[in-house]
């Protein structure tokens, strides 16, 4: 089932998500719904808080070298812990399903170790580089109540705030 994605400035986006302790059918349904929601929204990642569920659950499904997004490449990440493996940073243009129509460059670690649990509670580790590492860090920020717009420069944040207010004003006029 496709769920509704909550968008900025909804205060629930700024909640810290809770650790998952039950790896049951309810969690599996959430993961399946999140995948359907992410694909229907043309996303490469989604955190549970974005569908208004404050649990430490996220999905990442980036496009492969053939520009295809395959379900077998889907990462279901529960209770993640991210460890930078070096100090090298990478700058990528990021967007967010909870901050629609805004894209900006953000610096993040280029090489990380991800420790997490899968849908069955099994502990896993994954070394990630480049865009995969960036996508994981972006989604993990959601679990800690942060959005990518908090990582942009002051000037770019002012630009975002101005565009957001203008869009909100135009939306009210349309109603």
Swiss-Prot record:
What is the protein name stated in its UniProt record? Peptide deformylase
Ordered alphabetically, the record's keywords are: Hydrolase, Iron, Metal-binding, Protein biosynthesis
For whether the record's keyword set contains Iron, the answer is yes
Residues recorded as binding Fe cation, renumbered to this chain, are 96, 138, 142
Q: InterPro entries, from UniProt?
A: Peptide_deformylase, Peptide_deformylase_sf
What does the UniProt record say this protein does?
Answer: Removes the formyl group from the N-terminal Met of newly synthesized proteins. Requires at least a dipeptide for an efficient rate of reaction. N-terminal L-methionine is a prerequisite for activity but the enzyme has broad specificity at other positions.
Q: What is its EC number?
A: 3.5.1.88
Q: Report disulfide bridges, numbered on this chain.
A: none
Q: Catalytic center at which residues?
A: 139
The record's free-text note on cofactor binding: Binds 1 Fe(2+) ion.
Family named by the database record: Belongs to the polypeptide deformylase family.
Q: Which GO terms describe its molecular function?
A: metal ion binding; peptide deformylase activity
Q: Does the keyword Plastid apply?
A: no
What this protein catalyses is: N-terminal N-formyl-L-methionyl-[peptide] + H2O = N-terminal L-methionyl-[peptide] + formate
State its cofactor.
Answer: Fe(2+)
Q: Which Pfam families match?
A: Pep_deformylase (PF01327)
Gene3D superfamilies named in the record: Peptide deformylase
Query: Which SUPFAM superfamilies does the entry link to?
Result: Peptide deformylase
GO biological process per UniProt = co-translational protein modification; translation
**In terms of domain of life, where is this protein from?**
Bacteria
